[in-house]
Amino acid sequence: MQLEDFDYYLPEELIAQHPCDKRDECRLMVVDKKSGEVEHRIFKDVIDYLNPGDCLVLNDTRVLPARLIGNKVGTGGKMEFLLLKRIDKDTWETLVKPGKRAKVGAEFEFGGGVLKAVIKSIGEDGNRVVEFKYEGIFEEILDKLGQMPLPPYITEELENKEEYQTVYSKNNGSAAAPTAGLHFTNELLDKIRAKGIKTVFLTLHVGLGTFRPVKVENIESHHMHSEYYMLSKESADTINETRKNGGRIISVGTTSTRTLETIADEKGNVREQSGWTDIYIYPGYKYKIVDGLITNFHLPKSTLVMLVSALSSRDNILNAYKIAVENRYRFFSFGDAMFIK
């Protein structure tokens, strides 16, 4: 299949620049994965499409305020550091701009010297290995000094950092939010559980690779970035029990989906596991465990449009996207939601 097969027309004004005032009152498009039939609802109505005995799987990763603005020691030149991946306690793989000022041995400071950094090495991809020096707890310093690393298509500042976190976020480590989860409130989750639907959590730390465009014409030649995931024994047991009893596994977000499909064996059973995944899901892939998917509207020609197409069909999904544009749905990270059932 060709990359062009996953393109669609999107007016720029439909790219949401800020979240919905109330998380669970955004719009929800419900798509039947077999027929492609579309219904228009609001997000809190998702409960009407969940059955007692189903299991909702959510990603509890928490976004690090990983964008740091500082100065080069000696010259005072302004620098931007974006933390990509933790190597050990105080060492991170980091994207540094402007790169020409970030040579090995160069020193930088943030917050008037509360946090200091030195470049230890430079990778083939231009990313820097950076060692940080500070007193206290790194995450607390990052909370004070760091900014949210918003996607490039969001140009407005966040009023509140928590707007880019799910209400159940717990494990620090993501460079971007698992955005399908942003629509849930604690009240809605309580109502879902009260209806007899189980909720379980896994962790996948979302990397910046999620925003990297596909650069090959033949989609089968594309290689995914790798991301760290974790599934507990308790969550695995609940998922397996749900399937044994005939319930559906409803994945919240493409990150939960990729984690479940990585861990599941050929019979669709999962077990406690952690590791790195670079699973690439596109049409032709046979889902092993995920029955339904709650997700946002994704970028044209992205691997995420391919992933949702694999659960339904390319024609069904692109038709749903066309209907979404015609009905002025809001797109991307802060946009409206889709439930493929």
Curated annotation (Swiss-Prot):
Q: Give the EC number(s) listed in the UniProt record.
A: 2.4.99.17
Alphabetized Pfam families for the sequence: Queuosine_synth (PF02547)
What enzyme category does the UniProt record give?
A: transferase
Which pathway does UniProt place it in? Answer: tRNA modification; tRNA-queuosine biosynthesis
Q: Which GO BP terms apply?
A: queuosine biosynthetic process; tRNA wobble guanine modification
Q: One Gene Ontology cellular component annotation?
A: cytoplasm
Question: Does S-adenosyl-L-methionine show up as a keyword for this record?
Answer: yes
* Transmembrane region(s): none
Q: Which transformation does this protein catalyse, written as a reaction?
A: 7-aminomethyl-7-carbaguanosine(34) in tRNA + S-adenosyl-L-methionine = epoxyqueuosine(34) in tRNA + adenine + L-methionine + 2 H(+)
Q: Per its UniProt record, what SUPFAM superfamilies does this chain match?
A: QueA-like
Q: Which UniProt keywords apply?
A: Cytoplasm, Queuosine biosynthesis, S-adenosyl-L-methionine, Transferase
Q: Name one GO molecular function term.
A: S-adenosylmethionine:tRNA ribosyltransferase-isomerase activity
Query: In which compartments does the protein localize?
Result: Cytoplasm
Role, per record: Transfers and isomerizes the ribose moiety from AdoMet to the 7-aminomethyl group of 7-deazaguanine (preQ1-tRNA) to give epoxyqueuosine (oQ-tRNA).
Assigned protein family: Belongs to the QueA family.
The record's subunit annotation is: Monomer.
What is this protein called in UniProt?
S-adenosylmethionine:tRNA ribosyltransferase-isomerase
Organism, scientific name: Clostridium acetobutylicum (strain ATCC 824 / DSM 792 / JCM 1419 / IAM 19013 / LMG 5710 / NBRC 13948 / NRRL B-527 / VKM B-1787 / 2291 / W)
Q: Which gene encodes it?
A: queA
